[in-house]
Amino acid sequence: MGNLSGWFIHCPPLQWTLDQLETMMINTIKRGKVPQHIAFVMDGNRRWARQRRMETIEGHSSGFEALKSLLKVCLKLGVKEVSAFTFSIENFKRSKYEVDMLMEIAKNSLTQITAHGDLVDQYGIRIRIVGDLSRLQPDVLETALKAVEITKHNTKATLNVCFPYTSRHEIATSVQSIVKMAEDGTITPEDIDEDIFEKNLLIKDSLPLDLLIRTSGVERLSDFMLWQCHKNTEIKFIDFYWPDFSIWKFFPMLIQYQLQNQPA
């Protein structure tokens, strides 16, 4: 029975139908207001794996597949910027085994994304690694910098991979840069304003954050993009784990966003 249901799900006629439905939904949503900057807090990989009695690594791997699927749909819709909270600085407090495992997944994921030419090249994605890069293992850092270098000339869309990241670190880094500029005489205290502060953030030259989505039912931002959230940012807390986040759950959120942002 399991083999039969698996065949049915992956059979060509059904897959063709799903592809047609996806195209129809994308074309419909594109007629309305599409958020230009979407951020994801990808929470619940470990709990998703435990719920299914799987290894933790399987949860994180499935989470990466969900990100790829959603990223592709975002690009098809014309979203210009996607920010993904892939690893918090706080995650270094986990066991060495899990940290090493997450680093390996991140390295492999970045390699896959940059090697996946039909995604990166077709949609002109520029990858930015945003976070405290000094904490990365040498081989992971090398892969991250390579992804940035390979895609630096792309201008159609931006993927901010927040890894390892917290807003507190980002804000502290901006303050340190401004203090150094003042000490060097590059700026005076009177020059310091919001624009100077934003120009020294790790996530700089970004579009306003339109939509922030967090999975797993937890209703907090967990130190993610606190400066970038503004009065018009819509924040959605959804009650399922990240690996279960399919495009079919994403489409209704975008339609709801459009209904809530109709011209007066």
Swiss-Prot record:
Cofactor(s) demanded: Mg(2+)
EC number: 2.5.1.87
Protein's pathway: Protein modification; protein glycosylation
Places the protein is found: Endoplasmic reticulum membrane
Keyword check for Membrane: yes
Oligomeric form and interacting partners: Forms an active dehydrodolichyl diphosphate synthase complex with nus1.
Species for this entry: Schizosaccharomyces pombe (strain 972 / ATCC 24843)
Catalytic reaction annotation: n isopentenyl diphosphate + (2E,6E)-farnesyl diphosphate = a di-trans,poly-cis-polyprenyl diphosphate + n diphosphate
GO molecular function: ditrans,polycis-polyprenyl diphosphate synthase [(2E,6E)-farnesyl diphosphate specific] activity
GO biological process, one term: dolichol biosynthetic process
General function of this protein: With nus1, forms the dehydrodolichyl diphosphate synthase (DDS) complex, an essential component of the dolichol monophosphate (Dol-P) biosynthetic machinery. Adds multiple copies of isopentenyl pyrophosphate (IPP) to farnesyl pyrophosphate (FPP) to produce dehydrodolichyl diphosphate (Dedol-PP), a precursor of dolichol which is utilized as a sugar carrier in protein glycosylation in the endoplasmic reticulum (ER).
GO cellular component terms, A-Z: dehydrodolichyl diphosphate synthase complex; endoplasmic reticulum; endoplasmic reticulum membrane; lipid droplet; membrane
Family, similarity comment: Belongs to the UPP synthase family.
Name of this chain's protein: Dehydrodolichyl diphosphate synthase complex subunit SPAC4D7.04c
Keywords from the named record: Endoplasmic reticulum, Magnesium, Membrane, Transferase
PANTHER family on file: DEHYDRODOLICHYL DIPHOSPHATE SYNTHASE COMPLEX SUBUNIT DHDDS, DEHYDRODOLICHYL DIPHOSPHATE SYNTHASE FAMILY MEMBER
Membrane topology classification: Peripheral membrane protein
Domain of life: Eukaryota
